């Protein structure tokens, strides 16, 4: 009888996303949701992002990792889903060892030690540059998306340290981009390509992540009309 009380109180549960956003523990929420007797989900943009990442889309993978890094939630990937971030961490240390990465500081988390924070900032910068490249490659392959204005790396004057756009110049706050080739700024280095191939396999082969995303797909939609109410 005790177990039946929540069912009698809440006959059907609507979850209006995002579930995956800046906060900790979305995998814990998903585990709980999957046990509920009657539920539907209206996806948020971050939920769609993670579904894309689970499908192996590299731009989505890099973006999901970047958000986790920025808000101090890399444990979602490592502990929650068992995704190995060591190759990315090693690459970040080797590439930005002497760079304080002050433009890539963490937000919303005070639980890290100084060394952990420094490591996360380097990983944040590394995956951010990878994301810019991955998205640039996608936009180039699909001009029909009309997203060319989102590509900025080719607007940087690396000799003068400015970004030229719309007839104006903007002083860059950070010019340490050793992995960006000014002649081909959206190309991965061999190390970046290897990291992304590993991460692609890790996301696509993570059983728990795949279960969670299949549940979102089965129970979710962009919007839902319920009792004459629009949920989105």
Pin down the residues of each PLM region.
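Feature recognizes metal-dependent phosphohydrolase scaffolds
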Residues: 1-232
């Amino acid at each position: 009888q005790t177990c039946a009380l929540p069912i009698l109180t809440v006959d059907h549960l609507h979850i209006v996303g995002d579930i995956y956003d800046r906060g900790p523990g979305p995998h814990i929420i998903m585990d709980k949701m999957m046990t509920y007797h009657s539920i539907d989900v209206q996806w948020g943009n971050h939920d769609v992002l993670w579904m894309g990442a689970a499908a192996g889309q590299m731009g989505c993978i890099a973006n999901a990792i970047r958000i986790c890094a920025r808000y101090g939630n890399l444990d979602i990937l490592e502990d929650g889903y068992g995704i190995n971030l060591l190759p990315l961490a090693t690459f970040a240390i080797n590439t930005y060892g002497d760079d304080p990465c002050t433009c890539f500081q963490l937000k919303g988390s005070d639980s890290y030690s100084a060394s952990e924070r420094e490591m996360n900032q380097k990983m944040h910068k590394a995956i951010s540059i990878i994301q810019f490249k991955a998205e640039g490659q996608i936009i180039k392959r699909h001009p029909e998306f009309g997203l060319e204005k989102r590509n900025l790396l080719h607007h940087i004057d690396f000799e003068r340290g400015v970004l030229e756009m719309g007839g104006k110049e903007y002083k860059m706050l950070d010019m340490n981009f050793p992995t960006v080739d000014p002649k081909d700024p959206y190309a991965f280095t061999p190390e970046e390509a290897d990291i992304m191939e590993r991460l692609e396999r890790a996301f696509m082969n993570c059983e728990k992540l795949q279960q969670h995303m299949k549940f979102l797909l089965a129970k979710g939609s962009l919007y839902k009309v319920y009792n004459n109410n629009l949920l989105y």
